[in-house]
Curated annotation (Swiss-Prot):
Chaperone as UniProt keyword: yes
Quaternary structure and interacting proteins, as annotated: A double ring-shaped homohexamer of HslV is capped on each side by a ring-shaped HslU homohexamer. The assembly of the HslU/HslV complex is dependent on binding of ATP.
Signal peptide: none
UniProt xrefs under SMART domains: AAA, ClpB_D2-small
Binding site for ATP: 18, 60-65, 250, 315, 387
InterPro entries: AAA+_ATPase, ATP-dep_Clp_protease_ClpX, ATPase_AAA_core, Clp_ATPase_C, HslU, P-loop_NTPase
Keywords: ATP-binding, Chaperone, Cytoplasm, Nucleotide-binding, Stress response
Disulphide linkage map: none
Record flagged with keyword Metal-binding: no
Entry's family note: Belongs to the ClpX chaperone family. HslU subfamily.
GO cellular component: HslUV protease complex
The name this protein goes by in its record: ATP-dependent protease ATPase subunit HslU
Length: 437
């Protein structure tokens, strides 16, 4: 779990996301509160519940990007999932408890990586020993092994092929048992594939011929797993999920039951009802054991173009107490997105063209023109936020991108006149939807 202060979290998000100070502050405080709760002792620690967040803002303003960047910062089990993937219990499809099962799998993966790092030195030594066995045989003299060990460490044998036996991962080789109509869902607390694997005594790996360089990574992973206690790892992962898990529930506005509509919307309202106990706190059965959701942080987000936040069930609104409104992006914001962020669109485009030997030189007025065209098109067609910049920029460099292979060594200046020549005629057209999607 991250120990960053709220100010440090916001400054990290600022490197990649323009504006939206309120949303950044809200998620930074929520993330820091996870750490603060860990410092409490006694029964008070169990009483402190997470303050779940509802982010409201137009499409393309940064809601999902905040989630993506937060996942890297959190250092905790983090799951981003769309609310539209789920159906009411009783309907064909995935039920919302799958969220917790998926989060547990993420937690186990994170914990396994940490455990592997802790035993990496021992695992590397064991992997080296297995490669030496494959090269010179287990009965070779110590002097021979040491001679080959030196060559191995000097990377002199990397291209040599060896035959090694790798155990299949998980229940590989056995058929997967899924509930019909529920792709990816396991049968509650029982995983039939795992049970059959154990009953059959596991699967022996087939010998494979690969180079020494390719053999290292899978051998180290296999030897690491031998040194890790799976039961202890699972218990630790579940504890980490229960205490520090974060779920980002995107597109929550799409499960609102709209006024005057019926039919399929019944299932939408059912999904909201199913979410209530999950967000409030319940125990979910998974194949790894029961998981409590009392202290899992839920961050929901939606554009709410067609529906309103008040269309959510009142009980669900009450379980998302912190409301954050994200602002539509301005021309200045668009200019910042094009140039100021760490992996800005202009930097990406210039780097891609440099691979062909073509240097793109964007002037200040070109960047201003790109931003203004994007804002105009958003205003006259459909506001898709910052995603519009990608469409406009691709239109501008379309010809250069197509002929770049033949123009190696050239420097291509792109100014406002060049941008207008490529896209301004479209911006002036009232019906742009035929040209820009």
């Amino acid at each position: 779990m991250t120990t960053f202060s709220p100010r440090e979290i916001v400054s990290e998000l600022d490197r990649f996301i323009v504006g939206q100070k309120d949303a950044k502050r809200a998620v930074a405080i929520a993330l820091r509160n996870r750490w603060r709760r860990q410092q409490l002792k006694g029964p008070l620690r169990d009483e402190v519940a997470p303050k779940n967040i509802l982010m409201i803002g137009p499409t393309g303003c940064g809601k999902t990007e905040i989630a993506r960047r937060l996942a890297r910062l959190a250092g905790a089990p983090f799951l981003k999932i769309e609310a539209t993937k789920f159906t009411e219990v009783g309907y064909v499809g995935r039920d919302v408890e799958q969220i917790v099962r998926d989060l547990v799998e993420v937690g186990i993966g994170l914990t396994r990586e940490e455990k592997r790092k802790a035993v990496k030195a021992k695992a590397e030594a064991a992997a080296e020993s297995r490669i030496l066995d494959a090269l010179v045989g287990p009965t070779a003299s110590q002097a021979t092994r040491e001679s080959f060990r030196k060559k191995l460490r000097a990377s002199e044998l990397d291209d040599k092929e060896v035959e090694i036996e790798l155990a299949p991962s998980g229940s590989q080789g056995l058929p997967m048992f899924e509930i019909p109509g529920m792709p990816g869902a396991s049968m509650g607390a029982i995983n039939i594939s795992d049970m059959l694997g154990k009953a059959l005594g596991g699967q022996r790996g087939k010998p494979r011929r690969i180079t020494v360089a390719e053999a290292y990574a899978p051998l180290i992973a296999e030897e690491s797993d031998k040194l890790v206690d799976d039961d202890a790892l699972t218990r630790e992962a579940i504890r980490e999920v229960e205490d520090n898990g974060i779920v980002f529930l995107d597109e929550i506005d799409k499960i609102c039951a709209r006024e005057g509509r019926s039919g399929a919307d019944v299932s939408r309202e059912g999904v909201q009802r199913d979410l209530l106990p999950l967000i409030e706190g319940t125990t979910v059965a998974t194949k790894h054991g029961p998981v409590k959701t009392d202290h899992i942080l839920f961050i929901a987000s939606g554009a709410f173009h067609v529906s309103k936040p008040s269309d959510l069930l009142p009980e669900l609104q009450g379980r998302l107490p912190i409301r954050v409104e994200l602002q539509p992006l301005t021309v200045e914001d668009f200019k910042q997105i094009l140039t100021a962020t760490e992996a800005s669109l202009i930097k990406q485009t210039v780097a891609l063209m440099e691979t062909e030997g073509v240097t793109l030189d964007f002037t200040e007025d070109a960047i201003d023109a790109l931003a203004r065209v994007a804002v105009e098109v958003n205003g006259s067609v459909e506001n898709i936020g910052a995603r519009r910049l990608q469409t406009v920029l691709e239109r501008v460099i379309d010809e250069i991108s197509f002929t770049a292979t033949d123009r190696s060594g050239e420097t291509v200046p792109i100014d406002a006149a060049y941008v207008r020549d490529r896209v301004e005629d479209l911006a002036a057209n009232a019906d742009l939807s035929r040209f820009i999607l």
